[in-house]
Amino acid sequence: DVSSHYLVDRDGTIYGLVPEDRRAWHAGSSFWEGSTPLNPSSIGIEIVSVPLGMPEGTDVPFPAAQMKAVRSLVSDIAQRHHVRPDRIVGHGEIQPEGRTDPGHRFPWSELAHDGLIPTPNPALVARYRIEFEQALPDVGWLQKQLAAHGYRIRCTGALDQQTREVIGVFQGRYRQTGVTGEPDAETSALIAALTAPNGRVLEDHAGHFSPFQPEGAAQRPCPTS
């Protein structure tokens, strides 16, 4: 069975499908920040879109009316349930094995501009990028940092399929162009910034950034098997 709590149509209409106090079956075999599965503890929002690969679907954006509704709904849910900004995530992030939605076209930056989700500290990203353009970090380091950020990933030390899938989902969320699943200087810099002290920031409506470091946040281990 598949269900979600809400569906947001392209014209901005919001359909309530499952009461928030009931479990919906939207997250699949999911994991985030050590918690699994996530259906019992999450609220699922499906967003109507034109799939990639459809004849007219390659570059069809999410309409402004739809995104306004999404931002309003996310803000309302987050305020009522005291949802931490770093726990507002996409399906691909909690189930990267074969899932990429909402995809690299989804304008996460709009949620960031509303202060709903954290973003990497731009100054740190620039600093790390200079460093990683000289030499990329090894795959084992990337795996540990991705696990610390919240992803389900095993520390194999190899650029294997599961690592490429997680990197691809990460790229789709945090840079949205050049989604290759391959590590590069910019991807590594984004990962390094997000997992550094004061590396995540929240933006206010004036465009100012403030550090986001939730209480109780801990480094999560990276399993080897």
What do these predicted ranges mean?
Residues V50, I94-Q95:
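Short, solvent-exposed loop/turn segments at secondary-structure junctions
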Residues D1-D86:
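Active-site-adjacent loop/helix surface patches within enzyme catalytic domains
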Residues G28-F31, P63-D86, Q95-S225:
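Cell-envelope/ECM-targeting effectors and their regulatory/trafficking segments
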